[in-house]
């Protein structure tokens, strides 16, 4: 059975790249009737925080990504990691390295001065017992390093990239698998070792992650072999790039799922877009689909090797499509909390009125957040912008508004009645209909742009806001 995992580190909020990796893993599991599980990699004690774990889990749930088992907490498995390191030490496949940080820095500086790539020179690979005893007598602590054969050619078949090979000589020398500790102890186990141990313990069959892990995969394959563990298959997906073609990072501003959510993007649009970041849907499917629909056809043959450039226009288009498809009641459920957060008084408005407002605004929305500013004139009396003020100075504009105002009563307007009042006021002031309509929009909305005027007027009339605004505009 296919079993895949997402293994986020809770050192920050859910990044869009991590979320895209989650989407690909989830799609692959669902396509093959397998399981999608989580592992929280919280071994960075200083930076890992429970609030980040909560943010990651909440973000996945919001996107519609569910998991099939309780999340594994990596820090609770340290003893299993140390047992694996001890196994490698006992087999002579790992050793203790007493090189100090100062010595290692000097080594790297000398290499760079000679225009060589920095790497560990394996200086403590074959220490004698006497040499080890001397270092211990000095009070030196030791890391644990895994032996890497420079002549080894590491090969695997990548589900995205095909045949892959990596030279052992390009892995930077013998790899540290445990932090510095007294020589009779094993320090904190490090990433490449713990990932291998945990993936094997969790029966992971496919490791799906970003291409920035390719070098790690070469190292991890050696560890799988040394520990006698079954190999998973690997798929390295393209990185998400910014508009300049560089890896998307915090310097680009919006990178976390929380940011997108706060800006008013919907979960379905964001999940839809992340699926398209590096995957091409089959011909005829189009670009608008749900995760469930994508799961029926997802495969790695359609995952691109090249980096996926983040396209804000496409995301905005998808989000607009989602919002336009929402019914008024559903859109109201999404917008009302935002209106209340903005300080709009919604409690005095009926559900029917709020839903009519949503129906009016819906077709013009790209983001949910757009619905706040577009709705503002329906809750707060706007000041007249310059274009509205200029319109009211047009010949006959104020006379027509006065005629219209005099015909209004406390009774709520109906559409046909409103049209008749407009016609009568135009005749009374001897102006063209366009003059009055623009002037009425300026008086009601504070500007000459906005949603359908007649529907806007009827909503404001129903809320008892139209006569006061017209009167105020007339001065």
From Swiss-Prot:
Binding site for ATP: 250
Motif ('KMSKS' region): 247-251
Alphabetized InterPro entries for the sequence: aa-tRNA-synth_I_cd-bd, aa-tRNA-synth_I_codon-bd_sub2, aa-tRNA-synth_I_CS, aa_tRNA-synth_I_cd-bd_sf, Glu-tRNA-ligase_bac/mito, Glu-tRNA-synth_I_codon-bd_sub1, Glu/Gln-tRNA-synth, Glu/Gln-tRNA-synth_Ib_cat-dom
Swiss-Prot/TrEMBL keywords: Aminoacyl-tRNA synthetase, ATP-binding, Cytoplasm, Ligase, Nucleotide-binding, Protein biosynthesis
Lineage: superkingdom: Bacteria
Subunit and partners: Monomer.
Name assigned to this protein: Glutamate--tRNA ligase
Originating organism: Synechococcus sp. (strain RCC307)
